[in-house]
């Protein structure tokens, strides 16, 4: 894929929305560089809608929707979306909020099954900030190498 700077000017003028991933794309090597963030500010200032799309948890998405120059954040691999509208956060979820408790029990049961098959696995450090998914630590903070995971 070519960088946006290589797009023809006419094509750039037709862009209305920029959707972007975080890990390994917008954020490199666990670092959000100032220049990258400033680029996002410039995109938004030029009237282009900005939407972050990530597998990261609801807690992270809430912060991004409040403080980042974005129109919306899609999080937990599409399970939820947060948008800032008139100074307030609008929260949408793929699943009905009424199903949250039963859904969580199902996920906890699935993780318990995984633990019997893979005793060394652990939940991701940010699991407590998640609403609709379970994240297994795949060498982010665990002692297990990514190859083993």
Enumerate the language-model features and the residues they cover.
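Non-catalytic pre-domain segments flanking phosphatase-related domains
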Residues: 1-20
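A general structural motif
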Residues: 13-15, 47, 131
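Short, conserved charged micro-motifs
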Residues: 103-105, 142-149
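Short beta-strand-to-loop capping motifs
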Residues: 136-140
């Amino acid at each position: 894929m070519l960088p946006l700077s290589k797009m023809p000017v006419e094509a750039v003028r037709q862009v209305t929305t920029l959707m972007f991933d975080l890990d390994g794309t917008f954020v490199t090597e666990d670092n959000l560089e100032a220049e990258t963030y400033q680029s996002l500010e410039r995109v938004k200032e030029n009237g282009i809608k900005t939407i972050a799309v990530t597998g990261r948890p609801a807690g992270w998405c809430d912060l991004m929707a409040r403080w980042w120059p974005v129109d919306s954040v899609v999080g937990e691999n599409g399970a939820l979306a947060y948008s800032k509208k008139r100074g307030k956060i609008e929260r949408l979820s793929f699943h009905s909020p009424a199903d949250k408790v039963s859904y969580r029990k199902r996920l906890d049961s699935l993780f318990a099954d995984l633990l019997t098959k893979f005793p060394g696995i652990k939940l991701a450090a940010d699991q407590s900030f998640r609403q609709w998914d379970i994240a297994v630590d795949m060498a982010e903070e665990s002692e297990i190498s990514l190859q083993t995971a």
